[in-house]
Amino acid sequence: MAAKDVKFGNEARIKMLHGVNVLADAVKVTLGPKGRNVVLDKSFGPPSITKDGVSVAREIELEDKFENMGAQMVKEVASKANDAAGDGTTTATLLAQSIVNEGLKAVAAGMNPMDLKRGIDKAVIDAVDELKKLSVPCADSKAITQVGTISANADEKVGSLIAEAMEKVGNDGVITVEEGTGLQNELEVVKGMQFDRGYLSPYFINQPETGLVELENPYILMVDKKISNIRELLPILEAVAKSSKPLLIISEDLEGEALATLVVNSMRGIVKVAAVKAPGFGDRRKAMLQDISILTGGSVISEELAMDLEKSSLEDLGQAKRVVINKDTTTIIDGNGNKEAIKSRISQIRQEINEATSDYDKEKLNERLAKLSGGVAVLKVGAATEVEMKEKKARVEDALHATRAAVEEGVVPGGGVALVRVAEKISRINGQNEDQNVGIRVALRAMEAPLRQIVANSGEEPSVVTNNVKDGHGNYGYNAATDEYGDMISFGILDPTKVTRSALQYAASVAGLMITTECMVTDLPKDEKSSSELNSAPGNGMGGGMGGMM
C-alpha cells in the first residue's frame, strides 16, 4: 500500500479553502449579464470559450493534492446542480464558496463545527420553504421566453426560439440542440411519432422526386418477429387489397421471399405497401412497438401472446392519417389511437422515468414520452466559427434546461433578489445554541453572494447596491444589464425556482461537510516516495566502504 500524506486541523482546512477559492474565483467571473468569458485550453483543436460555470469547473485540476480535494468538492456542487436542474452551476459554486469561507472563519474562532452545520442546514430548510412561497407558475410563452433569454446570457432570440419549440411540441416534448449549418439559429419541428428506421427496400419509394415513401390513411401491421415466409402475410394482404388502402408493415425484420413478394406487389400496384424494421432492440423494441400500437389503435402480433400472424385480421391493424418514410426515419402522423389509452400509456412511462436509475434509461424513456405526447423539436444553432458554435450550443442547452425547470416548479425574481428576500424572511430564526445561530448567520450571509457577484461583475459597488435592494420590497431589485432598479418580473429577469433551490441545497450540503473536516489524507507525491524508498534501500551504505579498495 502506498504511503500517505496526512494533514490535520487548521493546516488541512487552509489548504482545502485555497482550492475552493481557486475554483470558485474562476467560475464566478461568468455570473450575470456582464459576466466575463473563460478560455479553456484543449489538448487538440482550438481553445473553447465559455460562460457556463460547470464547464469551467470541470476543467480545473490543481497540482497540490490537498488544495485539489477542496476544488473537487466544489466541482461536485456544480455537477449536482447541473444534473438536478441543468443550470445554476455558477450560483451553486458561489454559495458553496461563501458558506465555506464564513464557516471556516467561525471554526477558527472556536465555534463547534457540527453545531455550525446544524445551523446552516436549519437555515436552508426554512429558505427552501420560503422560496416555494415566493414562486409563481411559469405557464405562458412570454415567461418561458424571459427565462430562456436570461439563461442564454440575455440572448432574446434563443429565449423566443425555445418558447416557440415548447409551444409546438408541448412542455413534455423532446427538444434537442444540434449544430446547424448556417449563421442563424433555426427551429425544426417533427410532428407525430418518428423513429430511426427507414424503408427496407428503395423499390417501395412512391415519390421519386423526393426519394420518400408517402402513405395516406394507411393500415399499420405491427409484428414482434422476423417474417421470411409470404404465406403468413397473405390473409392480411388480401384484406388490405380489398379495402384499397395502403399498408405499412413494422416487424423485427422482413427478408427473402416475403420482402421480394411485397416489392413486386407494390411495383405492380396490386397493394400499395412499405416495410420497415421495428425501432430499438430487445425489451425496448417490444415497448416501442406497444407505443406505436397504442398510438395507432392496433395490436402487436406477438407469439408470446399466442397470436398467429396468419389468423390476424383488419381489426388487429392500426391506422394513421399519414406515414412518411425516408432511408433513415419513419414518421407516423395523427394515429387513430384511443386518446384515453394514449394518456394512460404516457402516465405509465412517466412512472417508469421516476423509477429509472440510469441516465441512459431516463433519456430513452423521455424520448418515448415525447413521441407519444406531441413530437420532437430540433434547435439548430448557427455560428460563424467552430469556437463560437461550441460556446453558443452550451448556452442554448443551459437555457433549455432552465426553461424546463421553470415550467416544472415555477419562477422567482432573478438577479439574486429571491435569495436576498428569503434571507430577510428567515433572519429571525434561532438554533438551539449560539454556535447554531452563527451557522444560520453564515447561511444568510451566503444568500447575498449571488447578488453581490452580479454587481461586482458589472463594475458597480456590491455593498451599495445590496443595501439599496434590501431597502426595497418584493420583486424590487437591480438590473445589472441596464444599471437600473425596479421590479425584476417587469424587467423580465426571472430565475427558475428549481435552479435556485437546487443551487442552495447542494451548496449547503457539500459546504457543511467541508466545514466539519478535521483531517485530510492523500497519496504522497511520486518523487517524494521514490526518494524516501531510495534512502531506505538495504544496500545504500555500500558506497562508503569502497574507498580502501585498490
Swiss-Prot record:
Cellular component GO terms held in the UniProt record: cytoplasm
Location of the region described as Disordered in the Swiss-Prot/TrEMBL record: 525-550
GO function terms (MF aspect): ATP binding; ATP-dependent protein folding chaperone; isomerase activity; unfolded protein binding
Localization in the cell: Cytoplasm
Reaction(s) catalysed (UniProt annotation): ATP + H2O + a folded polypeptide = ADP + phosphate + an unfolded polypeptide
Principal place of residence: cytoplasm
Transmembrane segments: none
GO biological process, one term: protein refolding
Assembly with partners or alone: Forms a cylinder of 14 subunits composed of two heptameric rings stacked back-to-back. Interacts with the co-chaperonin GroES.
Family: Belongs to the chaperonin (HSP60) family.
Protein name: Chaperonin GroEL
Organism: Buchnera aphidicola subsp. Cinara cedri (strain Cc)
